[in-house]
Design a protein with these regions (language model features):
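A short helix/loop element that forms part of the nucleotide-sugar donor recognition site in Leloir-type
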Residues: 51-69, 120-121, 218
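Glycosyltransferase donor-sugar binding loop
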Residues: 45, 79, 103-118
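A conserved mid-protein helix/loop that constitutes part of the nucleotide-sugar donor-binding site
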Residues: 74-97, 118, 238, 242
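Short hydrophobic beta-strand element within catalytic cores of glycosyltransferases
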Residues: 175-178, 188
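A short, active-site helix/loop in glycosyltransferases that binds the activated sugar's phosphate group
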Residues: 13-40, 45-49
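Active-site donor-binding acidic/aromatic loop of nucleotide-activated sugar
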Residues: 113-117, 130-139, 145, 195-196
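Conserved acidic donor-binding segment of nucleotide-sugar-dependent glycosyltransferases
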Residues: 190-191, 195-202, 211-217
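A short, well-ordered alpha-helix in the C-terminal region of glycosyltransferases
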Residues: 74, 211, 218-234, 243-246
Length: 259
């Protein structure tokens, strides 16, 4: 009740900004009378920060050493805060079904409580993934960390309101994988700039990971190039700011006219 009451206050303005169509649908479902007030303005990515040419080799080397990555093995990265709904267990189970060689780094999992980490480690041991999957703390240089990955996974089991990590990966020319729900459905065009797995399906997630790992270099580079252009055109920080300021000006103009 309290959450809905709090959210209802947010609907009292002249306009409502939704950070994704997923959030727009949620607002419409809870407060159908304000549907005409909603404007979708997706969150944006800083294309200077998440630009491969702006990440110096020294930063990449430092992160590679910090993550203790092995040479000549594809890198799978999941970067998220230590919360079970982010899909850590789903990813571990999916990885147990992947036959291709890989190494996976769970960035952020190392910040979790001892109990949280023990649950993940127990599953890693159960599936004999000790040599393939590791838990590390949050990265102080996420750009350099992500650029080391061949695949970036966001396996959230609860739909993300948006999920900017996918766009950050795409801006760096990487291949993101996520379940087909929430904000991920708006930022990944399946097979063109990433892969979408059937919601909550471990088998589907495993298949998408295998598919991404087996891509030929030319196909991988083509997807990466498309991803960078896709983010630049549709999800840049500058675009987000321009759309937001435009809406503010519209609200001010309407207030001056109507009082």
């Amino acid at each position: 009740f309290l959450k809905k009451y709090y959210n209802s206050i947010l609907t009292k303005g002249n306009s409502i900004i939704a950070i994704s169509k997923h959030i727009e649908d949620s607002i419409k479902k809870s407060f159908p009378k304000v549907s005409n007030k909603i404007k979708v303005i997706h969150r944006g990515v800083d294309l200077d920060l998440f630009n491969p040419t702006n990440i110096k080799p020294a930063r990449i080397i430092a992160q590679s050493k910090l993550l203790n990555l092995k040479d000549n093995l594809p890198v799978i990265i999941m970067a998220a805060r230590p919360a079970m709904w982010k899909g850590y267990l789903s990813l571990i189970k999916a990885l147990s079904k992947v036959d291709e060689n890989y190494q996976c780094v769970l960035i952020g999992a190392g910040d979790g409580s001892r109990k949280f980490q023990d649950i993940l480690i127990k599953q890693i041991v159960k599936f004999n993934l000790e040599t393939k999957v590791k838990l590390v703390k949050s990265s102080r240089d996420i750009q350099a960390s992500l650029i080391l990955g061949d695949i970036i996974i966001m396996p959230s089991v609860t739909p993300e309101p948006f999920g900017r990590i996918i766009l950050e990966a795409q801006a760096l020319g990487k291949i993101p994988i996520a379940f087909d729900h929430g904000g991920a459905s708006e930022t990944i065009i399946n097979g063109k700039n990433g892969f979408l797995a059937e919601p909550l399906s471990i088998q589907s997630l495993s298949e998408k990971i295998s598919l991404a790992l087996s891509l030929e270099t030319i196909k991988r580079e083509k997807m990466g190039d498309y991803s960078k252009k896709f983010v630049s055109k549709n999800f840049s920080h500058d675009r987000m700011c321009k759309l937001t300021l435009s809406l503010y000006k519209q609200c001010i103009a309407e207030y001056k006219t109507n009082g």
